[in-house]
Design a protein with these regions (language model features):
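Domain-level signature for soluble enzymes in the chorismate/prephenate branch of the shikimate pathway
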Residues: 1-316
Length: 316
């Protein structure tokens, strides 16, 4: 079949012809259960045939080259990296862990600014938080990945141990207000519930919260952040760790606008839109089975055209 289509310039998929054949096969029985079973069986046979045809066309060079370039390794030394927040932020720590302590990195106020920096060529890579083991996904990052033509090329898992940061000499009795990122406040909610008289105020970044406490020089204010943030802003670690999940970690993704992947990559993230019809997701997931991949996560998102985001890893 593939040889015929190569020779005659035919497309692999002829949807109308497949539907016609399935209708003919379904009409061989009057039983609705058997009809459905026969059609599903031959749908799978046709799908397997198409996958093999696409593979053969690729081997013959008919279907074109893969749009992503394979590279040996990301050059982590000769590049500019952007992250959201200020020095001492968890994103800053993740940046230094992935790109090295001498990384040529700079910070911007928002995650969107990170994406814009890549788009405009000001930065080669951005380091963005995408999920936390306690608080879940960072939905705004998924929205930005959908909006911008940027691609995930790596990840950094950062163990998160939140600390209560205050001016040197601050006692717990003096505290009236605690500042931090909403997720950090959530991850420390059990600890904060023991201090119900403390007002919780959200800021855009844990390190920015530390910076505010340092600049205001008010002992009634504290921040939740990293010990590194305390060091950068001259604060004292009053208590640590205060997050209730002692295995708390955040996954940061390394994003670029270049279509490339490392030779030893074993994870792929895919975002796609499906019609709201029976079997549409089922048919897409068949590609994961066919290519011997193990799906470790799937997420359905509402409000953006029924977007489904999946992540798969190659089976060992």
């Amino acid at each position: 079949m593939a040889e015929y289509k190569i020779a005659n310039g035919k497309k692999v998929l002829d949807r109308a012809r497949e539907l016609e054949k399935l209708e003919t096969l379904g009409n061989l029985t009057n039983d609705s259960f058997n009809r459905h079973g026969i059609q599903e069986l031959f749908q799978q046979i046709m799908a397997m045939s198409r996958k093999l045809q696409y593979q053969l066309l690729a081997e013959e060079g008919v279907s074109g080259n893969l749009p992503f370039t394979r590279i040996d390794h990301i050059d982590r030394k000769h590049c500019r990296v952007v992250y959201q927040g200020v020095e001492g932020a968890y994103a800053h720590e993740a940046t230094l862990q992935y790109f090295g302590k001498d990384a040529n990195a700079f910070h911007v106020p928002t995650w969107r600014d990170c994406m814009e920096a890549i788009k405009e060529g000001v930065a080669d890579y951005a380091v963005l938080p995408i999920e936390n083991s306690s608080a879940g996904e960072v939905n705004d990052i998924y929205d930005l990945l959908e909006e911008y033509d940027n691609y995930i090329v790596g990840e950094q898992i950062l163990k998160i141990n939140h600390a209560l940061l205050g001016l040197p000499g601050t006692s717990l009795d003096e505290i009236r207000t605690v500042y931090s990122h909403p997720q950090a406040l959530m991850q420390c909610s059990v600890y904060l519930d023991k201090h119900s008289d403390w007002q919780r105020i959200s800021l855009s970044n844990t390190a920015m919260a530390a910076k505010k406490v340092a600049e205001d020089k008010d002992r009634s204010q504290v921040a939740i952040g990293s010990p590194a943030a305390a060091g950068y802003h001259g604060l004292e670690v009053l208590e640590m760790p205060i997050n209730h999940n002692r295995f708390n970690s955040t996954r940061f993704i390394i994003v670029t606008n270049r279509k490339m992947y490392e030779a030893d990559a074993k994870k792929v993230g895919i975002c796609f839109e499906l019609p709201h019809t029976s079997g549409s997701l089922y048919n897409i997931l068949s590609h994961i089975i066919y290519n011997d991949l193990n799906m470790c996560k799937i997420e359905s998102r509402d409000g953006h055209g029924n977007i489904v985001q999946t992540e798969t890893t190659v089976t060992e």
